[in-house]
């Protein structure tokens, strides 16, 4: 019995040690407020979505507990800066969706990687869409595995509410029904997709 307890204690310590010491595993997660993470930070303008300091453990994103967050001894800004180095582009499938006139309406990005949603925070994410959509884009993140990118100018993104809401409702890991603007100034929520 003592060995089992010792092994359990060691495994719990190992998870905490990884979270605290392996900064390469740190990520800023974009999560729904209804998950009630112990530690979260606001996204400008967002009501239903927050930033959560997290880390990868056994292939899954985990939230920092309040105790583990405090134990890191880092500020939110320092954590974000370090996590941004980890927010590299993932291997994802993406496609440009065009209208009948062959004009790109949006980009659909999906992957089985549970960090797909975090790619919008990668330093080069905005640059990838600059030539197609301009320097400011709108983004929908309905679940951890799916991102939709829309042009900010002359965008009809609200026409896609049924698509976004279906991806949000049907997921085991929903993220947000909100729409975000990403620009050189950062990320902020600008509205909410709604069911028709």
Tell me the role of every PLM-derived stretch.
Residues 2-7:
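Sec-dependent signal peptide recognition
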Residues 14-15:
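N-terminal signal peptide c-region/cleavage motif recognized by signal peptidases
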Residues 19-196:
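Contiguous interface-forming segments/domains that mediate binding rather than catalysis
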């Amino acid at each position: 019995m003592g060995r089992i307890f010792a092994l359990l204690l060691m495994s719990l310590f190992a998870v905490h040690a990884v979270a605290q010491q392996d900064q390469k595993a740190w990520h800023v997660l974009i999560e729904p407020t209804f998950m009630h993470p112990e530690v979260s930070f606001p996204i400008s303008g967002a009501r239903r979505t927050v930033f959560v300091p997290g880390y990868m453990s056994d292939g899954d994103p985990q939230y920092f507990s309040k105790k583990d967050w405090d134990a890191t001894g880092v500020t939110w800004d320092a954590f974000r800066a370090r996590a941004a180095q980890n927010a590299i582009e993932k291997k994802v499938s993406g496609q440009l969706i065009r209208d009948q006139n062959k004009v790109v309406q949006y980009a659909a990005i999906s992957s089985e990687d549970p960090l797909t949603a975090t790619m919008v925070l990668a330093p080069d994410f905005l640059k990838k869409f600059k030539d197609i959509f301009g320097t400011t884009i709108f983004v929908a993140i309905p679940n951890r595995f799916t991102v939709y990118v829309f042009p900010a100018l002359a965008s009809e993104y609200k026409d896609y509410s049924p698509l976004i809401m279906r991806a949000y409702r049907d997921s085991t890991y929903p993220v947000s029904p909100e729409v975000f603007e990403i620009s050189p100034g950062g990320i902020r929520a600008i509205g909410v997709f709604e069911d028709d």
